[in-house]
Every structure is written in structure tokens, then in C-alpha cells.
Regions:
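A general structural signal for short secondary-structure junctions and capping/turn motifs
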Residues: 32-36, 122-126, 151-154, 163-166, ...
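Short helix/strand-capping turn motifs
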Residues: 193-285
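Glycogenin-like
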Residues: 55, 124-187, 207-208
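Conserved aromatic-histidine-acidic binding/catalytic patches
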Residues: 67, 71, 106-109, 113, ...
Length: 285
């Protein structure tokens, strides 16, 4: 089915996640084994901490297929318990466990899998299912300060998490002594409210403006993080060798016609790239 979905480097039909986390068995299984409705699966959102603050964990949960990048002060077993207690769902999707990571024993499979799997990440967070958000890093307690909102590793400043905004997300990592200071709580609530409104009234230039202030490990990921938000059809593959300018060219050809019209009518200058009817990637960034 996945091979049939790919036509000329485009994903032409809806594709479910390749793998899901079976919470009862505590094992990663193929999606077809679970055969679960998308809205009955718990999505897990988190910002990746810096390399010096994380470690690679080999675990039987994913059959030791690849090392799972984790914050040094987090524990997969504790995350499993928290997720089990968060909702009644039996399956979850966590990128570090369900998306093949680097340096695994079948590394040669990762590039091909990512072409299809990375563009479909937004689908996991866009089908109205419940989600758990760890705002301070995967499995870490919710200890936020005002300085954290300016950190390049903050959930509110990562490129990938822009597509992971859920209206009624469950806040992960809460403990009894995690009461936020009043000013921090106000900032936290304001940021969430602003992002949720942005999702309710989508505008391509507003998404682009938001992405300007966000960080990504690879420049290309900023473009890839817009694919789901801009209702692309068909969906471009994730090509790690592609430049962000080329990826933007491809994206603007397949985004929803309303977003193309917005670029044409409302961007104040002609494009300085390959097309004059819409701005180049450098212009929007």
C-alpha cells in the first residue's frame, strides 16, 4: 500500500503511521497489527533537548531496532506509566520510538522510510485524537521559567511542534510541586491560546511568520513542518538532500488553492525566486 501511495515523489493517498506503540504490551508494533482508528490513538508531542542533554537508549520496546534519543533525566518506563494513566487509549505514537532513528542496525532503511513517514507526522496530530504534550522535553517534569520561553529548545520555539498544536492537549510531566509562578502561567496560557487560534483560522503568511522565530536542526525541516498545516495534496516526500528553497518551490505547487491565492494577493512584493507570483523562501523567512 505504501509503494502504491508514492507517485513521482508525491504521496497521493492517506497513509497511516508505519508503527504504533502498543501500551498494553509495551511494544512497538506495525500499524496494521494494531488496526486502530486514528482518533483512538494517543499522540505524544515534545521538543527534542540538545545533544549534550540527551542519551541514546537501546530498549526492547522497539526490539532494539535503533537507539531511542532521550533526555538524560527521563525514563521510558516512567513515560509508559504516565501515558497509560493519561487516557484509556491502548495505542500511542511517539516519534523517538515509532519513527526509525539514526544509527540503528538497519540504517539503510531509514532514508527511504523518512521520505514517506516524516511528511505524515502532521497527520498523527491532525485527526482529533487526544495528545500528551511534554513542554520541557520528553518525560521531563513541567518546570518552566520565563527564560525557558526564549530557549531554542522550548516547545514553543521548535519548527516541528508548530504542526502539533492540539486544542485539548493533556499536559505531561505534571507533579504536585509543579505550580507555575503566576507570570509564567500567564505566558504559558497566552502562547497556547495564540497558537490554537492560529490553527483555527489558518493563514499561510501567519504560519510563515511564526516559523521565522522557530528553530530546527536542519533548515529543510522548517519547510517540512508546514506541509500538513497548508493542506497539501498530493503531499511531497521528505528529501533530506533537498534545499529549503527547492522544497518551498515544490510545496507552493501543492498547497491548498486558498493559500496560493493568499501568497499571490497579499504578499506585498513580487517573488525574487523562480516565480514572481509568490515569495521565495528567503522572502518569507
Amino acid at each position: 500500500m505504501r509503494r502504491r501511495a508514492l507517485v513521482h515523489d508525491r504521496i497521493t493517498t492517506g497513509v497511516s503511521p508505519r508503527r504504533v506503540w502498543d501500551l498494553c504490551a509495551n511494544r512497538v508494533v506495525p500499524y496494521w497489527v494494531a488496526d486502530v482508528n486514528p482518533w483512538a490513538m494517543l499522540a505524544i508531542s515534545h521538543p527534542w533537548v540538545s545533544e549534550e542533554d540527551r542519551r541514546d537508549v537501546m530498549t526492547p520496546i522497539n526490539g532494539y531496532e535503533w537507539p531511542v534519543p532521550m533526555p538524560k533525566d527521563a525514563n521510558l518506563d516512567l513515560i509508559h506509566i504516565e501515558i497509560l494513566n493519561a487516557e484509556e487509549e491502548h495505542y500511542a505514537w511517539l516519534d523517538a520510538l515509532c519513527l526509525r532513528q539514526e544509527h540503528g542496525k538497519n540504517e539503510h532503511l531509514r532514508v527511504d522510510e523518512w521520505k514517506l513517514d516524516v511528511p505524515m507526522i502532521g497527520w498523527v496530530y491532525g485527526t482529533h485524537q487526544p495528545a500528551v504534550c511534554y513542554f520541557n522535553g520528553l518525560g521531563r517534569p513541567l518546570h518552566l521559567t520565563l527564560r525557558d520561553f526564549e530557549s531554542d529548545r522550548c516547545w514553543f520555539r521548535r519548527a516541528w511542534t508548530l504542526q502539533e498544536i492540539i486544542r485539548d492537549a493533556i499536559i505531561g510531566g505534571q507533579t504536585e510541586d509543579d505550580a507555575m509562578e503566576q507570570e509564567v502561567r500567564r505566558k504559558f496560557d497566552e502562547q497556547l491560546t495564540r497558537l490554537r487560534r492560529m490553527r483555527e483560522r489558518p493563514r499561510v503568511l501567519e504560519f510563515a511568520s511564526e516559523m521565522q522565530n522557530r528553530m530546527s536542526t536542519k533548515p529543510l525541516d522548517k519547510v517540512a513542518g508546514l506541509v500538513h498545516l497548508l493542506r497539501t495534496e498530493p503531499i511531497p516526500i521528505y528529501d533530506a538532500e533537498q534545499s529549503e528553497a527547492d522544497a518551498w518551490d515544490v510545496l507552493t505547487h501543492v498547497i491548498h488553492y486558498k493559500f496560493r491565492a493568499e501568497l499571490f494577493f497579499f504578499y506585498p512584493q513580487p517573488g525574487d525566486g523562480r516565480k514572481c507570483w509568490r515569495p521565495s523562501w528567503e522572502q518569507v523567512m
